[in-house]
Amino acid sequence: MDMRVPAQLLGLLLLWLPGARCAIQLTQSPSSLSASVGDRVTITCRASQGISSALAWYQQKPGKAPKLLIYDASSLESGVPSRFSGSGSGTDFTLTISSLQPEDFATYYCQQFNSYP
C-alpha cells in the first residue's frame, strides 16, 4: 500500500502542529452576573491581540450544544432574535441583550477565528 502523503496535504497538516502559531487568549467579563427579565445585559470579550472582526458569540444551555448567535463580531445569525447584538473589532468586543427574556438565561461564550493554537 502506498503510504505517501501528498505535499499539499502535508502542508495543511503542518499548519495544525501545536505551537505553530501563537495562541490568542480571550477574556470574558463578567464571569457571572445576576439579571432579571427585561434587563439590558452586556458581556464583554477581550482578545490578547488584535483579531479584526473574527469573533463569534454562542449561547449554551445545560445539556445542549452551543448555539451560534453572532458571527464576524456583529452579524446576527439567521433566526436569532434581534434583541441580541454584537459590536467591536480589534481586541474589544461586546454582546448585548437589549431586553432579557426568560429563554435567554444561559451561558454565553466568545470564540475567535483569527488564528488557531
Curated annotation (Swiss-Prot):
Transmembrane segments: none
Signal found in the keyword field: yes
Ig-like domain ranges (all copies): 23-117
Pfam families: V-set
CDD domains in the cross-refs: IgV_L_kappa
UniProt-annotated stretches for the region Complementarity-determining-1: 46-56
Disulfide bond as UniProt keyword: yes
UniProt cross-references to Gene3D superfamilies, sorted A to Z: Immunoglobulins
Function statement: V region of the variable domain of immunoglobulin light chains that participates in the antigen recognition. Immunoglobulins, also known as antibodies, are membrane-bound or secreted glycoproteins produced by B lymphocytes. In the recognition phase of humoral immunity, the membrane-bound immunoglobulins serve as receptors which, upon binding of a specific antigen, trigger the clonal expansion and differentiation of B lymphocytes into immunoglobulins-secreting plasma cells.
Protein name as it appears in the record: Immunoglobulin kappa variable 1D-13
Organism field: Homo sapiens (Human)
